[in-house]
Each structure stands twice: as C-alpha cells, then as structure tokens.
Amino acid sequence: MNGKLQSSDVKNETPYNIPLLINENVISSGISLISLWHTYADEHYRVIWPRDKKKPLIANSWVAVYTVQGCGKILLKNGEQITLHGNCIIFLKPMDIHSYHCEGLVWEQYWMEFTPTSMMDIPVGQQSVIYNGEIYNQELTEVAELITSPEAIKNNLAVAFLTKIIYQWICLMYADGKKDPQRRQIEKLIATLHASLQQRWSVADMAATIPCSEAWLRRLFLRYTGKTPKEYYLDARLDLALSLLKQQGNSVGEVADTLNFFDSFHFSKAFKHKFGYAPSAVLKNTDQHPTDASPHN
C-alpha cells in the first residue's frame, strides 16, 4: 500500500505502512527444468552416463540430488566418490558425473536437472544435511503432482515451486559454512547412522563416536533435530522399513530381521505407533499397486 493509511475506529489496531522494498530492484533467476525424477531404488540400481541418460548432456545445466532416505553413491569423472544419505541435498555439474548407484538396501531420491535463466550462485559439490526433511518431502510430492498435471499453468507452478525450494537449499548451504563444530559432529553421526541402520545402535554407542556423555548427546540431538537420539534412530529405521515393505518379496518378519528389531511383534508395534497402521497393510496395498523401483535418468 502506498500513501497514507485511512483512520480506523478500532482502538486496538496498530496502523503501519512499512516499505519492505523501495530503494532498489531485486532480480532473481528462475530455472528451466530439463528433467525431474523421483527414484526409489534397490541394491540393483546403477546408472552410467552418458550410456543410460535419456537426454543429452548440457554444459551449462545443473543437477540437484535430494536424498529422501537410504544411501546412494555418485562417482565423478575425476575419480571422486560422493556418498549421499537421507536427508541431504547436493548440487553437481552433469558433465562431471560418471555414474551413480544405490549403496545398500534402498535409495530414494529426487533427481532434477535444470538451467538457470540468469546468474545463480550455486555451491557445487557441497552436501548439506536437511533436518526438516518431512517438509521438503511433502513439498516435492506436491511438485510431482503439479508437474504431471495436463494443465500447463500447473506445470509452471511446479517449476516456480521447485525454484523456491532450490533457493532454500542454496541459502541453507551458505548458512552451513557458518555452523558450529558441534553441529558438524551431529551431522557426521547422523550420516553414520543412516549408512548402518541394520546395526543395533545404543545411545552409548552413538555418544562414543563424538565422544561425549549420553546426556550431552541427547541435548545436541534435541537442539538440532527436535528428537532424542533414540527417537531419531527409531524413526530412521521405521522409514526404511516402510520402503522395504513396499518392495515386492519382503515379508514383515524379513524386514524386522534385516533392521535388527527384537522380533516381528515389537517391530509391528513400533511401526503402527509411528504410521497408524500395521506393516501387513503395506504388503496388501503393494500387492494391489506394484510400482517400478528402478527408473533411469
């Protein structure tokens, strides 16, 4: 609103007219989205570029890889290997990528290739841990629905939505450069946990990797993740369990054994407490709606 505010008869209303931007223009780059993949992969998933690439490599494009859960590995042409755990984000230049594959039981990720419409300051090769992964997971689900809509205006909204998310990730990466050593220690531990969810971790085991007391580890986890170490580890195992149950051929007992739960009863109880339904319900739904877990880029 410009000019003067009209007077109001409401006594407790505080009038204001604050110029949030007035002295200069702000120009923000958009993106041209080349491809967007939502991949849920098992241990057989491996992609080699350019052999398996559906579209030609574009020199000025970028690849953003957002790992939802599990573990994946990207091999660059210079021999560098990048291991990705859920939840994390990384930006890479597609011309640098040699291959990528699932490292472990499952790798769920969003793989997006895009070109900025103007200058975009993107940190290349820098991994950032995403603590509020549920928010991004939901937003990317919305993007997937919009981008597959037959309505062009919804496709445009999907790309605008994705541009907003990309800028959030870039801002997060620049903030990461200023983070304290304690947060780096927790992120390193979180990466280790996600890489070995089949292992039975006690809070004492986790604290020993820092090293610190169990009480101090609890305080750090609550500060950075909003969960205790035990809650975080259990949630990560249950999220992976849900994905494994969606894979055809995995029984409830096999998933419980794979993720080192005491037995199927304790696994089912924890699963239902988190998701609100029994693990057997996932198997029934998967049998009715089989999905392809290995799309290629």
Swiss-Prot record:
Keywords: DNA-binding, Transcription, Transcription regulation. Pfam families: AraC_binding (PF02311), HTH_18 (PF12833). SUPFAM superfamilies: Homeodomain-like, Regulatory protein AraC. Residues 187-285 form the HTH araC/xylS-type domain. The keyword DNA-binding applies. The keyword DNA-binding applies. Coiled coil: none annotated. PROSITE patterns: HTH_ARAC_FAMILY_1, HTH_ARAC_FAMILY_2. SMART domains: HTH_ARAC. Residues 204-225, 252-275 bind DNA. InterPro entries: AraC-bd, Homeodomain-like_sf, HTH-like, HTH_AraC, HTH_AraC-typ_CS. One of its GO terms (molecular function) is sequence-specific DNA binding. This is Uncharacterized HTH-type transcriptional regulator YidL. It comes from Escherichia coli (strain K12). The gene is yidL.
